[in-house]
Amino acid sequence: MIYGIGTDICDVRRIRASLARHGERFAQKILSDAEFATWQARSARWPERGVRFLATRFSAKEAFSKAIGLGLTMPMTWRSCEVGNLASGKPTIVLHGALKDWFDARALSAHVSVTDETDYAASFCVVESL
């Protein structure tokens, strides 16, 4: 049964501006440790890839927070929600700490889709109860 649906569109230009203004601190606030390492590697190779990576993660986390109905209130935090990828490349939600406990206690499962184009990153998330 569907527990919740969330969607988000993120303006990549706003993410780029925030990075220019706040530097790595902005990325550290949004990304988990694993995501931050990936962001650093992508940014080193091609800075625009790093910006797009951060924008897609920002968008996916916003969509997930809407799907679970909490928004960005505890236990949902930027860093406790990680967007990983399966071996196939499919994006997946990986949770940590109190958010994982909250999610597991409700026997929920999440599915996320992420895309980006020149100026926008968009995500769609469906959370279902098992």
Curated annotation (Swiss-Prot):
- The residues the record assigns to binding Mg(2+) are 8, 62
Q: Which UniProt keywords apply?
A: Cytoplasm, Fatty acid biosynthesis, Fatty acid metabolism, Lipid biosynthesis, Lipid metabolism, Magnesium, Metal-binding, Transferase
The primary gene name is acpS
Q: Which pairs are disulfide-linked? A: none
Q: Pfam families under this entry? A: ACPS
Write out the GO MF terms: holo-[acyl-carrier-protein] synthase activity; magnesium ion binding
Q: Which cofactor does it need?
A: Mg(2+)
Know the name of this protein? Holo-[acyl-carrier-protein] synthase
* Listed InterPro entries: 4-PPantetheinyl_Trfase_dom, 4-PPantetheinyl_Trfase_dom_sf, ACPS, Ppantetheine-prot_Trfase_dom
Catalytic reaction equation(s): apo-[ACP] + CoA = holo-[ACP] + adenosine 3',5'-bisphosphate + H(+)
Which Gene3D superfamilies would you find in this protein's record?
4'-phosphopantetheinyl transferase domain
Please give the function described in this protein's UniProt entry.
Transfers the 4'-phosphopantetheine moiety from coenzyme A to a Ser of acyl-carrier-protein.
Q: Keyword Transit peptide, does the record have it?
A: no
Q: Where are the transmembrane segments?
A: none
Where is it predominantly found? cytoplasm
GO BP: any one term: fatty acid biosynthetic process
What EC class does the entry list? transferase
Q: Which family does it belong to?
A: Belongs to the P-Pant transferase superfamily. AcpS family.
Q: Which EC numbers does the record give?
A: 2.7.8.7
**What species is this protein from?**
Albidiferax ferrireducens (strain ATCC BAA-621 / DSM 15236 / T118)
Localization recorded for this chain is: Cytoplasm
This entry carries the following GO cellular component terms, namely:
cytoplasm
